[in-house]
Amino acid sequence: MANLRKTHPLLKIANDALVDLPAPSNISVWWNFGSLLGLCLATQILTGLFLAMHYTSDISTAFSSVCHICRDVSYGWLIRNIHANGASFFFICIYMHIARGLYYGSYLYKETWNIGVVLLLLTMMTAFVGYVLPWGQMSFWGATVITNLLSAVPYVGGALVQWIWGGFSVDNATLTRFFAFHFLFPFVIAAATVLHLLFLHETGSNNPAGINSDADKISFHPYFSYKDLLGFVAMLLGLTSLALFAPNLLGDPDNFTPANPLVTPPHIKPEWYFLFAYAILRSIPNKLGGVLALLFSILVLMVVPILHTSKQRGLTFRPLTQFLFWALVADMLILTWIGGMPVEHPFIIIGQIASVIYFTIFLVLSPLAGWAENKALQWA
């Protein structure tokens, strides 16, 4: 049997990725989030599949079908709560995974990093179209506001929006196609994840010290397989606790009201995990400018490897850039808070300042800090 896993064409691939994979001996708990994301994706696909068996993508029955799932389907309430809150845990893991990459310089594996950014965009797109499906007030108005942003595209904007809507407003055609996209995208994400892993295994994992670890590698199984298992238990405990004790904690009360095109909710806002990007979008008074800022708030991650100036890889021994990293974390929390607030004084100016700081840290201060630390090393 020991030989079969090393020789069988299919088992060999699994063996090289999950059993005999050489891994640095000093990788910390921050390296757990990759496998946790895999677990999140599997959970979402599985719960989503069971929800799709009972859901109807028609504006006259969508809201009722979700009610039916929660009331009449065996454990439907649990499946829906796990799916809805699983999305929140998915994004918590994504943001932690990206933060780890930024802190320890994992972005220097450029192919792996860029596929990761594409994965983030795909996941955000999937979550957005999924949020529209229950056809509540916030689903409908969220879809209207976000799809309307495409009208800012010069010359073809108007036609583009109507093409995506499948008509002159968000209607039945929109809901049907969003359901089709929401069903399809997770499998695209799974395929892109395979590519992400393929490129990662070309180089091997980075480690907290940021130095070559070829001299000190250990096998993935049993060491990190059990370490990942501990992460699985912790995350599933958190997810089930949230789904069972406070399933609506992170949702919007407006979504318990069926969609009504004639009544606009007082505050239109996305789910909590998009609030930071929504705050950046709202901080610019110009429509096209806001859309570009929204886009670049994510795409800025792609320029991080290009702007890396330091001679050291991670931030473990770089206090100046460490300060910038934690300033960025604080800034994102402020943006998340502002995204959920009404557009009025003082929230407008706070959002604008936080947005400027967000881009300044990425594009100006981090490269400068790396350069300054190199100079300090020369003087030492």
Swiss-Prot record:
State the superkingdom.
Answer: Eukaryota
Q: Name one Pfam family in it.
A: Cytochrom_B_C
A Gene Ontology biological process term: mitochondrial electron transport, ubiquinol to cytochrome c
Q: What are the GO cellular component annotations?
A: mitochondrial inner membrane; respiratory chain complex III
Q: Which UniProt keywords apply?
A: Electron transport, Heme, Iron, Membrane, Metal-binding, Mitochondrion, Mitochondrion inner membrane, Respiratory chain, Transmembrane, Transmembrane helix, Transport, Ubiquinone
**Which note does the record give on the cofactor?**
Binds 2 heme b groups non-covalently.
Residues holding heme b b562: H83, H182
- Quaternary organization: The cytochrome bc1 complex contains 3 respiratory subunits (MT-CYB, CYC1 and UQCRFS1), 2 core proteins (UQCRC1 and UQCRC2) and probably 6 low-molecular weight proteins.
Which sites bind a ubiquinone?
H201
- State the taxonomy lineage: Eukaryota, Metazoa, Chordata, Craniata, Vertebrata
Which InterPro entries does the UniProt entry name for this protein? Answer: Cyt_b/b6_C, Cyt_b/b6_C_sf, Cyt_b/b6_N, Cytb/b6-like_sf, Cytochrome_b, Cytochrome_b_C_euk/bac, Cytochrome_b_N_euk/bac, Di-haem_cyt_TM
Q: Which GO terms describe its molecular function?
A: metal ion binding; ubiquinol-cytochrome-c reductase activity
Its biological purpose? Component of the ubiquinol-cytochrome c reductase complex (complex III or cytochrome b-c1 complex) that is part of the mitochondrial respiratory chain. The b-c1 complex mediates electron transfer from ubiquinol to cytochrome c. Contributes to the generation of a proton gradient across the mitochondrial membrane that is then used for ATP synthesis.
Relay the record's extra comment: Heme 1 (or BL or b562) is low-potential and absorbs at about 562 nm, and heme 2 (or BH or b566) is high-potential and absorbs at about 566 nm.
Signal peptide feature range: none
Q: What is this protein called?
A: Cytochrome b
Q: How does it sit in the membrane?
A: Multi-pass membrane protein
**Which locations, inside or outside the cell, does it occupy?**
Mitochondrion inner membrane
Q: Which cofactor does it need?
A: heme b
Task: Give residues annotated as binding heme b b566.
Answer: H97, H196
